Amino acid sequence: MKISPVRPIVVTLFVSFVSIASVLADVPAGWIIAGSAAKDYEFARDGTTAASGKFSASITAKSDASANGFGTLMQMIDADNYRDARWKLSGYLKTSDATRAQMWMRVDGLDRKIVSFDNMDSRPVTGTTGWTRYEIVLDVPSDSVDIAFGFFLAQAGTVWGDNFKLEKVESTVPVTSPTSVPPSRPKEPANADFEN
């Protein structure tokens, strides 16, 4: 049976920010610990491996980690400087015995309504892998309020993340998730009689 963390990440990222004093000392500056089972994971700034530079961040499942939860390192930024454009989140992930490791990006509108979302659910990183670059492309509509992004681990193993970058791309670059809201909608119904 496939366990999909799509629903948990959508719901719990709004309400499950976790402050764990003993872990916060190792959390990279600017990043937040969250997730439906963040207490089941160890988060760290890691100086033993990096895609480039000296450091990466890691998420490691504890031996008794919940089979239904996940832990994430994330950031949430104001969408003011990103509206009315298509944006690409890229980053490097490396895994060791990972059940599911995934990079993710979410665009929120008013009242925390999700307007664009991709968490690589159809293309998770599993097992043991070397440093590999991944990309997510989403639209940020004019009514966007926040952009959240990060990477997570579900169930078991370790994932490292490094060199995340958010950059504007042309509208010809395809979005990576069908949940993206088109940049504009038609003003009138089209082909209502199906003759075209």
Name each region found by the language model.
Residues 1-6:
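N-terminal secretory signal peptides that target proteins for export/translocation
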Residues 9-21:
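Bacterial N-terminal signal peptides
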Residues 22-196:
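Extracellular and organelle-lumenal recognition/adhesion modules and their flexible linkers in secreted
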